[in-house]
Amino acid sequence: MRSSSKKKIDISNHELVPKHEILQLEEAYKLVKELGIKPEQLPWIRASDPVAKSIGAKPGDIIKITRKSPFTGESVTYRYVITG
């Protein structure tokens, strides 16, 4: 007989999921000032995204995403967390 309890899987440990981290307020401020933009002008990620949920991201946060790249070694992008 199967158990009805659901297992929680940490998808952030999968090799194809890049590292996601929430920027501290001062880091986020420095980033948008350096880029000369408003946070909302960054590409968006929904708070309901599985990785955003797993790291506890809330609307208004900025997430730094670090991907491994065979060409550059590392590629860094940023996402603004929106409701949804």
Curated annotation (Swiss-Prot):
It catalyses: RNA(n) + a ribonucleoside 5'-triphosphate = RNA(n+1) + diphosphate. GO terms for molecular function: DNA binding; DNA-directed RNA polymerase activity. It comes from Sulfolobus acidocaldarius (strain ATCC 33909 / DSM 639 / JCM 8929 / NBRC 15157 / NCIMB 11770). Disulfide bonds: none annotated. This is DNA-directed RNA polymerase subunit Rpo5. It is an enzyme of class 2 (transferase). The gene is rpo5. The lineage of its organism: Archaea, Thermoproteota, Thermoprotei, Sulfolobales, Sulfolobaceae. One of its GO terms (cellular component) is DNA-directed RNA polymerase complex. DNA-dependent RNA polymerase (RNAP) catalyzes the transcription of DNA into RNA using the four ribonucleoside triphosphates as substrates. Reconstitution experiments show this subunit is required for basic activity. Keywords: Cytoplasm, DNA-directed RNA polymerase, Nucleotidyltransferase, Transcription, Transferase. Part of the 13-subunit RNA polymerase.
